[in-house]
Amino acid sequence: MKNVDYKLYLVTDRKVLKERDLYKSIEEAIKGGVTLVQLREKEMSTLDFYESALKLKKITETYKIPLIINDRIDIALAINADGVHIGQSDMPLIKARELLGKDKIIGVSAHSIEEALEAERNGATYLGVGAIYNTSTKGDAQAVSLEELKNIKNSVKIPVVGIGGINEENANKVIETGVDGISVISGILSAQKIKDKARVMFDIVKKNSTK
């Protein structure tokens, strides 16, 4: 897929939403400026994940933004999602690319220049680099400083997205490193007015972007 806008990358987490409806919340976030959505549900059955992905795909297609599936290549293939995001301990990138084909988006988590360069060599579409700040949604996240984020961005040619604990207060510092976008969970989904918060975050990215 060409010309993907990584500016404001929303990752789902039902725990953050609590009792609020996932699909309405995601739609509100998209209306506020989210440019990319990743369905990430680690504790869901395959059937529930599949059905959730199908519902979410209808929304993302309506607004013409990509839907990325976290880890589950089988689900991505089953619903013809725009791509997947995989971590360092998930299926090898080369095998994922073989299964998905050359046109699908494949994002890879990276925590160092070495991991970033290897992912780029093996065909990653973009990199998710972090955690930049402490995050409650991924307790085992490896820390990456802003300086390291900047160095990783400067070492590769593919897009880089900063991830981990990014919110309204610190988003500008992340964007100023030169990255292509920020990945947000709680920074948007924990807000009472999700659409308004997404708009604030989008404006911060746009204002501070070096691109």
UniProtKB/Swiss-Prot annotation:
Cofactor: Mg(2+)
GO cellular component: cytoplasm
Any GO BP annotation: thiamine diphosphate biosynthetic process
Superkingdom of this protein's organism: Bacteria
Classification via CDD domains: TMP_TenI
Positions of 2-[(2R,5Z)-2-carboxy-4-methylthiazol-5(2H)-ylidene]ethyl phosphate binding: 135-137, 165, 185-186
Co-factor binding comment: Binds 1 Mg(2+) ion per subunit.
Reactions that this protein is recorded to catalyse: 2-[(2R,5Z)-2-carboxy-4-methylthiazol-5(2H)-ylidene]ethyl phosphate + 4-amino-2-methyl-5-(diphosphooxymethyl)pyrimidine + 2 H(+) = thiamine phosphate + CO2 + diphosphate; 2-(2-carboxy-4-methylthiazol-5-yl)ethyl phosphate + 4-amino-2-methyl-5-(diphosphooxymethyl)pyrimidine + 2 H(+) = thiamine phosphate + CO2 + diphosphate; 4-methyl-5-(2-phosphooxyethyl)-thiazole + 4-amino-2-methyl-5-(diphosphooxymethyl)pyrimidine + H(+) = thiamine phosphate + diphosphate
Residues the record lists as binding 4-amino-2-methyl-5-(diphosphooxymethyl)pyrimidine: 38-42, 70, 109, 138
A molecular function (GO) term: thiamine-phosphate diphosphorylase activity
A Pfam cross-reference name: TMP-TENI
Record pathway: Cofactor biosynthesis; thiamine diphosphate biosynthesis; thiamine phosphate from 4-amino-2-methyl-5-diphosphomethylpyrimidine and 4-methyl-5-(2-phosphoethyl)-thiazole: step 1/1
Binding site for Mg(2+): 71, 90
Keywords: Magnesium, Metal-binding, Thiamine biosynthesis, Transferase
Record SUPFAM superfamilies: Thiamin phosphate synthase
Enzyme Commission no: 2.5.1.3
Purpose: Condenses 4-methyl-5-(beta-hydroxyethyl)thiazole monophosphate (THZ-P) and 2-methyl-4-amino-5-hydroxymethyl pyrimidine pyrophosphate (HMP-PP) to form thiamine monophosphate (TMP).
PANTHER family (alphabetical): THIAMINE BIOSYNTHETIC BIFUNCTIONAL ENZYME, THIAMINE-PHOSPHATE PYROPHOSPHORYLASE
Protein's UniProt name: Thiamine-phosphate synthase
Organism in which the protein naturally occurs: Clostridium acetobutylicum (strain ATCC 824 / DSM 792 / JCM 1419 / IAM 19013 / LMG 5710 / NBRC 13948 / NRRL B-527 / VKM B-1787 / 2291 / W)
Lineage: Bacteria, Bacillati, Bacillota, Clostridia, Eubacteriales
